[in-house]
From Swiss-Prot:
Reactions it catalyzes: a 2'-deoxyribonucleoside 5'-diphosphate + ATP = a 2'-deoxyribonucleoside 5'-triphosphate + ADP; a ribonucleoside 5'-diphosphate + ATP = a ribonucleoside 5'-triphosphate + ADP
Subcellular location, record wording: Cytoplasm
Name of the featured protein: Nucleoside diphosphate kinase
Pfam families, sorted: NDK
Cofactor(s) demanded: Mg(2+)
Keywords for this protein: ATP-binding, Cytoplasm, Kinase, Magnesium, Metal-binding, Nucleotide metabolism, Nucleotide-binding, Phosphoprotein, Transferase
Family according to the record: Belongs to the NDK family.
Top-level lineage group: Bacteria
Length: 141
């Protein structure tokens, strides 16, 4: 059973879209194996997005991710990484498929509602960044 990391970003948390987004995941068959709401520090956001450190949007991304609380989740299910990415839609909400999370709730490339792991390898890294193994409940459903 695959696991992937999902983050509901500050824009969606601030607009009270948490429940709607979780419902999309659950209706697709993904299950929540771990979840918490946190307000990232600068150090945490920089550490999480370190792969983008040399990119021109890095500081803007960090500033956005620390602008309010986020909901961090481990989603579990068959093909969890790919399913989550399909549910999220394209990074740019204007290009995201109709009905996708980013089409429904995203505003721009930078303010795009959710983050999701882009590969199984990165999912493992990202999950361990936020959760200890003891915090993850393997679902039986």
């Amino acid at each position: 059973m695959e696991q992937t990391l999902s983050i509901i970003k500050p824009d969606s948390v601030g607009k009270a879209h948490i429940g709607e987004i979780i419902a999309i995941f659950e209706k697709s068959g993904l299950r929540i194996a771990a979840m918490k709401m946190v307000h990232l520090s600068v150090k945490e956001a920089e550490g999480f997005y370190v792969v983008h450190k040399e990119r021109p949007f890095f500081q803007e991304l960090v500033d956005f991710m620390i602008s309010g609380p986020v909901v961090v989740m481990v989603l579990q299910g068959e093909n969890a990484v790919d399913r989550n990415r399909e549910l999220m839609g394209a990074t740019n909400p204007k290009e995201a498929a109709e009905g996708s999370i980013r089409a429904l709730f995203g505003e721009s490339i930078g303010v795009n509602a959710v983050h999701g792991s882009d590969s199984l390898e990165n999912a493992a890294i990202e999950v361990s960044y936020f959760f200890a193994k003891t915090e993850i409940v393997n679902s039986v459903a």
